[in-house]
UniProtKB/Swiss-Prot annotation:
Any one of the GO CC terms: periplasmic space
Signal sequence interval, chain numbering: 1-29
Compartment annotation: Periplasm
Organism in which the protein naturally occurs: Salmonella schwarzengrund (strain CVM19633)
Protein name in UniProt: N-acetylneuraminate epimerase
Amino acid sequence: MGMQMKNFKKMMTLMALCLSVAITTSGYATTLPDIPEPLKNGTGAIDNNGVIYVGLGTAGTSWYKIDLKKQHKDWERIKSFPGGAREQSVSVFLNDELYVFGGVGKKNSESPLQVYSDVYKYSPVKNTWQKVDTISPVGLTGHTGVKLNETMVLITGGVNEHIFDKYFIDIAAAAADESEKNKVIYNYFNKPAKDYFFNKIVFIYNAKENTWKNAGELPGAGTAGSSSVMENNFLMLINGELKPGLRTDVIYRAMWDNDKLTWLKNSQLPPSPGEQQQEGLAGAFSGYSHGVLLVGGGANFPGAKQNYTNGKFYSHEGINKKWRDEVYGLVNGHWQYMGKMKQPLGYGVSVSYGDEVFLIGGENAKGKPVSSVTSFTMRDGNLLIK
C-alpha cells in the first residue's frame, strides 16, 4: 500500500508539472526559415542589432546571417570563413565584430583531426574576416564561452589538446589494421575521467586589449560539450562530458562581479520521467525566457554512469548513443521537467533574442545534421515550442 501511495504521489506531481507548463504551439513565437544547409557541430552568435550569424560545422566554411528585425526574414550568405572547415568552435560578438575561437578540423585532406587554438574575427560592416594576432592558452575544442560585456568573453572547459590529437594520430596510423585500430580505440576510452585532463581553467579574453587572463578554476571536474548561459551577471555551466561517453548532471553556477568570478552552490538536472537517474547531457540547447532557464535536447549514453560507478572505465562500451528530446526549466530556483521537443536533437546552435530561445540546426537521432529552426518561449507559465 505504501509503494502504491508513493507511485500515486509521483504520478500526481508529474501531472501537476505537465499542467502548469504544458507544451503548445503559438502565434506568439517567431517563425524562422530553415538554414540554407544542414548544420551540426557549428557555432553562432547574435549581434546587438538582432542579427543572428551561424556557420562552420557541417556547413564547412560557410556562414549565414538573418535579421530578426526585418518583416521578411531570410538567411543571407556572408563571406566564407578563411580558417578552414572546423567543428565545435565558440563564437561571440565583441566590439560589434564576430569572434570565433578554436575548434577541431584537418589542415588538409591527408592530415588527422587536430585541436585549434586560433582566433578569427568578422566585420559585418566590411564583410571581411581577419585572423587575430593571438592564440588561446590551451587548445579549444569542446569548450564553451559566454559574453561578459562588449569587450570580454569567458571561455572554459574542453578536451586536452595533446591527448585528443594523439588519439587521432594513432587512429590514422592504424587505419589499415583493424585489430590495431580497435586496440587504439579501447585504450583511449578505457581510462578514468581524471586521465583525460579536460580543461578546468576559466579564461577571460579581452578583445580591446587582445589579452588572455586566468580567472581561476571550475569548482569541480573539467567538462567538454557543456552548454553555458549568462543572465544578469550569473553564469550557468550546464552538464557536459567528464570523459568521452560519460556525462555529468551537475550544473555549475557563478556570479561575475567587479571582474571576479565567485562560484555558488551547484545544482543537478533531474531525471527524465521513467528514468532512475539523470545521465547528464552533452550538446544541449539552452537559454532564458521570462526568467526561466530552459535546457533541452543533447545526447548521452543511458547506463554509462552506472557502468563507471561499477568500475568500468570504458563506460559507454556497447551502449547506443541516445539523442534526447526532453526540456527542463529552472523555475523559481528549482529544476523541473517541462515536456518534449518536436524531435530528439543536439549539437546545434542556441541563440537568445528577447524572451525567445532559437534552436538552430543540430543532429537528429540518426546522427544526421538538420536545417530546421525552432524556438522555446515561456508564456503565462507555459512552454511554447514553435
